[in-house]
Amino acid sequence: MTAALAVVTTSGLEDGVPRSRGEGTGEVVLERGPGAAYHMFVVMEDLVEKLKLLRYEEEFLRKSNLKAPSRHYFALPTNPGEQFYMFCTLAAWLINKAGRPFEQPQEYDDPNATISNILSELRSFGRTADFPPSKLKSGYGEHVCYVLDCFAEEALKYIGFTWKRPIYPVEELEEESVAEDDAELTLNKVDEEFVEEETDNEENFIDLNVLKAQTYHLDMNETAKQEDILESTTDAAEWSLEVERVLPQLKVTIRTDNKDWRIHVDQMHQHRSGIESALKETKGFLDKLHNEITRTLEKISSREKYINNQLENLVQEYRAAQAQLSEAKERYQQGNGGVTERTRLLSEVMEELEKVKQEMEEKGSSMTDGAPLVKIKQSLTKLKQETVEMDIRIGIVEHTLLQSKLKEKSNMTRNMHATVIPEPATGFY
């Protein structure tokens, strides 16, 4: 991993990097640099750029209905549960993007099993995972950024993405202004004209026989004309005008290139001479400062030894006092635990007492209240009235029953006397 993790080795040096020995073991631990804590921010920014190249906004965020994370989302702790879910889903998408089948994790899945599956896929790509799986359970940190960055690189390799060379901007220099547009020749035009002249010369060299015949005829004509007097037919004013017209076109401007190695070599020589001259002056001061620092460190070490020897008894007393303090703290913790238990029992007893008091108050209020007594009196009065009415009804019923019995008895006697006919009465008729 590119992040500055603590690596255990068996030697004091590996790849020219100094290492310090761990206390109590024979192993050697790689020292973390001062910028190791900020390396995960760089990895996270690279991860965001790689995800943009993989079009994760269209293919992952919109389909999963998720919010786009910030540039340092997995580097800083915000919401561990949300970050862990985002890490698992993004890792699964990157694994599928890299050509490996991987099921999308759900919220109810076991996090340990999910992390184990992700790490196994990471090792199958040939990447190292020399850290405990619990580092990924938080959902943020350098290990989370490392795992996602590895999956993003594998996905880019699978889709055949290649990084192109950077295109540096061309620095444009100010050119001299000329009245006419085409009054200036550049170095490219000069090269083109030079190439055209070379091609013309080659064509002339090919037709050597024709050239010899032409030169022979010209020599014959010149020998015939040498007998005449040579006179110039050129006008001086026209010649000067032609020179003034052609002169701007003959000007050649060569652009200076800032990337020319000659300029850099000169600058390097200048810087080297400046460094050597400055080193001669500062070397003496640096040597003097080094000697003073060495003497000061020796004095500090000797003073530390003297102070340790002088304060050894006080240090022992301090350690004994620390031990007594720890024992007192333990006893205090034990006593505090008993007090807490008794306080809990007291609170329970107080609750029961409050309940009893409340019940007593309710009963006392019910006893002192006259409303129930009034109700009882009213009920008794009503019962008495009902009893009188019932007695009257009973008397009426008894009287009616007695009358019915007397009437029945009289009817019976009447019937008995009506059925017996006296015999002497019949003889007189």
Curated annotation (Swiss-Prot):
It is found in: Cell projection, Cilium; Cytoplasm, Cytoskeleton, Cilium basal body. Pfam families: IFT57. Residues 335-426 are annotated as: pDED. Disulfide bonds: none annotated. The pseudo DED region (pDED) mediates the interaction with HIP1. This is Intraflagellar transport protein 57 homolog. The gene is IFT57. Required for the formation of cilia. Plays an indirect role in sonic hedgehog signaling, cilia being required for all activity of the hedgehog pathway. Has pro-apoptotic function via its interaction with HIP1, leading to recruit caspase-8 (CASP8) and trigger apoptosis. Has the ability to bind DNA sequence motif 5'-AAAGACATG-3' present in the promoter of caspase genes such as CASP1, CASP8 and CASP10, suggesting that it may act as a transcription regulator; however the relevance of such function remains unclear. The keyword Metal-binding does not apply. It is linked to Orofaciodigital syndrome 18: A form of orofaciodigital syndrome, a group of heterogeneous disorders characterized by malformations of the oral cavity, face and digits, and associated phenotypic abnormalities that lead to the delineation of various subtypes. OFD18 is an autosomal recessive form characterized by short stature, brachymesophalangy, pre- and postaxial polysyndactyly, and stocky femoral necks, as well as oral anomalies and dysmorphic facial features. One of its GO terms (cellular component) is axoneme. GO terms for biological process: apoptotic process; cilium assembly; heart looping; intraciliary anterograde transport; intraciliary transport; keratinocyte proliferation; motile cilium assembly; negative regulation of keratinocyte proliferation. Belongs to the IFT57 family. Residues 304-369 form a coiled coil.
